[in-house]
Amino acid sequence: MLLERIYNHVVREKQWNIGFPDKSLEELVHGASFSVRMLRHSYTDRWFADPFVLEVTDDEILLLAEDYDIHLRRGRISLLTVERNTLELKKLTPVLDVPRHLSFPCIVRRNDKVFIMPENLFGEGLTLYEFDQKTCSCRKEKVVSTQPLADAVLTDVFGKEEMLLGTYLPYDNPVLHTFVYNAQREEVRQESYVFADKTARNAGAFFECDGKLYRPAQDGKLYYGQGIVIQQVTRDETGRLAFHEVCRLSSPTTGQPSRMHTLNSYKGVTVVDMAACQHPHIARVAVQLKKHFCVIKR
């Protein structure tokens, strides 16, 4: 137990920030090398992670993201208005704050409305909120699930049915659970998928590229935020999904933060989040011990 606490402290204690890859989503899927321009901001009491792109204009990028207060040790969901040319944070607007930690604000678009479904592991579960961009406010729509799912995604990419996908803690849980809902929003089917390489946890929303469907997944084999795995997703006639790895994304250079666990894209803008360990040299030794000698086990 003591070794586990020490490992978590040196490997997982870090501050996240949002980044913008210099390559298109299509290029990333095809394995192109890339660098990342980081969000510029002056906040020292908080960090930002789990970005989803809300809107893109000629001048601005609007993001919904986890806004983590270092002193409260709790996240809320905020709207980040980013200057597109400089990637400077122009405005930070809280949009959803509850007594429990919130993160991973999955965006769901239905007709002309925008909804968000943030992770809320220790609250009432996964709640869908209608987001009003004019007032930057959220109205509770419904509780989608009371299951304590991490980094859950709600999607209708498979047609009339909606699908909820998520994992249970710990972060390296190898099982992805899916819940399928009919047009009346009634649950009609549950399934599970085991990932031996511990890439079950979502890293963002499904996306299409070159006519194919992909899922960004988290690589959690050795530690939280190890990298992102892009998986092509297919579906058979019974509704069963299949996941095929096509590429892996990790910190592009040694001069940039070494962790990455979210990727999303909308209207040609792709975002990730990245972080560096507070104790990088010790963390490197700890990871090698876990990898080669199995001294530290989760």
Per-region residue spans from a language model:
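Carbohydrate-active catalytic/glycan-binding domains of CAZyme proteins
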Residues: 1-298
